[in-house]
């Protein structure tokens, strides 16, 4: 489950065998233009093993799914709102809390990298995504850090590959046992 405080993002997260599985399918298995919020299919089944937990959702014009990311990104209060925003991911056994540290628009896909050859390559990845950010935040990260990446389309008809990308740095984990 995902909740982003200060927004209406409050949805179950699914994971399919491909990234197309839940693109136009709801959590009940029915066709839905809005699809579902879903993890990248390449992520490890055990959530805690992922260095970069990539989560996709549509930018629906009716305000649902990840539309709130676009609304937040385009707002004049983006930086001040990010100060109190939290990304919460609930699994069966834990709550993972992330603090936003990077946000940008991208027409690439390297932000969705889920496998890293080494911890040094992961830190290099963190440096890259941090340098792209429009946020004025300088959170400290290192090779032991973990992040989540929220991704939604911009609905830019001139560039259909362009995405809004929001990265959160894992700051707390609460175990339910």
Q: What label would you give each PLM region?
A:
Residues 1-177:
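Solvent-exposed, non-transmembrane regions of membrane-associated and secreted proteins
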């Amino acid at each position: 489950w995902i909740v982003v405080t200060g927004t209406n993002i409050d949805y179950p997260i699914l994971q399919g065998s491909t990234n197309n599985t839940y693109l136009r399918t709801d959590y009940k298995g029915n066709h839905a233009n809005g699809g579902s919020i879903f993890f990248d299919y390449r992520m490890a089944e055990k959530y805690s093993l992922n260095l970069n937990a990539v989560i996709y959702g549509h930018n629906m014009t009716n305000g649902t799914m990840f539309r709130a990311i676009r609304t937040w990104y385009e707002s004049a209060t983006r930086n001040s709102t990010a100060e109190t925003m939290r990304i919460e991911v609930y699994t069966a056994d834990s709550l993972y809390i992330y603090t936003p540290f990077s946000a940008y628009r991208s027409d690439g896909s390297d932000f969705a990298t889920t496998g890293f050859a080494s911890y040094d390559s992961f830190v290099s990845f963190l440096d890259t995504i941090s340098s792209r950010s429009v946020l004025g935040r300088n959170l400290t990260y290192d090779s032991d850090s973990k992040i989540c990446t929220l991704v939604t389309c911009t609905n830019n008809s001139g560039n259909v590959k362009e995405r809004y990308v929001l990265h959160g740095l894992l700051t707390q984990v609460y175990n339910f046992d």
